[in-house]
């Protein structure tokens, strides 16, 4: 069976055979060959330099040791590059009397499965190799390392034997028939799969062609429809031109021009009225805001020590623009600092939060009539924000009360941000 793997991986490895195992370098002609030596092999990752497989001990003819039942870990099954280390036990007669048994690596080979040399479907006993050279069995045949000396030492057939072979009848062993049957079955499977793939591709091509033909027909119908509409428009345009040409002195065109000018004048008047109304509404809103500020000046909301809005007012006028810039969010650190400084000031803190929320509610809902991101229901010192959270500093130190207060304060600060964005459009000062 010929080789059929397009890409070889460790998961295709079946066994490893090591040929001509020797502890002595034969090129130096030193020492003698040892008959039987226990050996094992180690497969090592070339990147991490860590072994991922160690075989069992094998003892036999050193001309060829066969290592089977290779169990490769799953993380290395797709590996194509690894290193084979051949370890052998040094015979006792080569050691000193006081030395324990010793092992050594007789050879180390780096194996790239994509660069192996194909030998055949079966291992040939007439192949001679260099010493300590491995042969690798994949699922599609036997391979050897590249650039290694491999010689075939088959028996020479004499002429007499060759003549006798002519008179012999050709025989077909059972194993050859089995191999031929497997090869025929494999070839038939390949042809069948090829035919199935060809039929699928032909069906896809036909379906794609049909889809393209349908789209082309749709485009052609749309083009015809557009051309017919264009023809209708051309006819209407021609009729309009004929009607215009029938006009005597162009008085009707002058009437059309006068009507256009009239429309422009009316639009300018309406726009001017709307602009004046808008300015009047903005002035009224500013006036209401200043009145609201004057009302809350009687509270401690703007007090620098107790209040939550740090803004200094003059005696005669209020700079609305400066007030808008200084309208700040309530800091949780500010609340806790005041509480730590005056532990009995919980009622004052809640009163300031209530005044601040009442200020936002009156201006948003009554003056500018704008909704806030989170609804505010004023209930004195226990204002409800977002319909479920109380904006009041908790007297109890429980974790749940603190979390609810923090959520309510964050929602209230988002309302202040919405409020200041609208106030940012006010750029003029109003004098009281």
Curated annotation (Swiss-Prot):
Function, as annotated, reads: Involved in endosome-to-Golgi retrograde transport as part of the VPS34 PI3-kinase complex II. This complex is required for the endosome-to-Golgi retrieval of PEP1 and KEX2, and the recruitment of VPS5 and VPS7, two components of the retromer complex, to endosomal membranes (probably through generating a specific pool of phosphatidylinositol 3-phosphate allowing the recruitment of the retromer complex proteins to the endosome). Mediates the interaction between VPS30 and the VPS34-VPS15 core complex, leading to the recruitment of VPS30 to the membrane.
Pfam entry (one): VPS38
> Where, per UniProt, does this protein localize?
Golgi apparatus, trans-Golgi network membrane; Endosome membrane
- Chain ranges passing through the membrane: 348-365
- Coiled coil ranges: 216-287
Per the UniProt entry, the glycosylated residues are 20
Q: Name one GO cellular component term.
A: Golgi apparatus
Report the principal subcellular site.
Golgi
Taken from the UniProt record, the cysteine pairs bridged by disulfide bonds within this chain are none
Family the entry assigns: Belongs to the VPS38 family.
Quaternary structure annotation from Swiss-Prot or TrEMBL: Component of the VPS34 PI3-kinase complex II composed of VPS15, VPS30, VPS34 and VPS38.
Q: Which organism is it from?
A: Candida glabrata (strain ATCC 2001 / BCRC 20586 / JCM 3761 / NBRC 0622 / NRRL Y-65 / CBS 138) (Yeast)
Query: Matching InterPro entries, A to Z?
Result: Vps38 (IPR040939)
Knocked-out gene: effects: Deletion was unsuccessful, possibly because VPS38 is essential for cell growth.
Give membrane topology per the record.
Single-pass membrane protein
Name of the featured protein: Vacuolar protein sorting-associated protein 38
Keywords assigned by UniProt, alphabetized: Coiled coil, Endosome, Glycoprotein, Golgi apparatus, Membrane, Transmembrane, Transmembrane helix
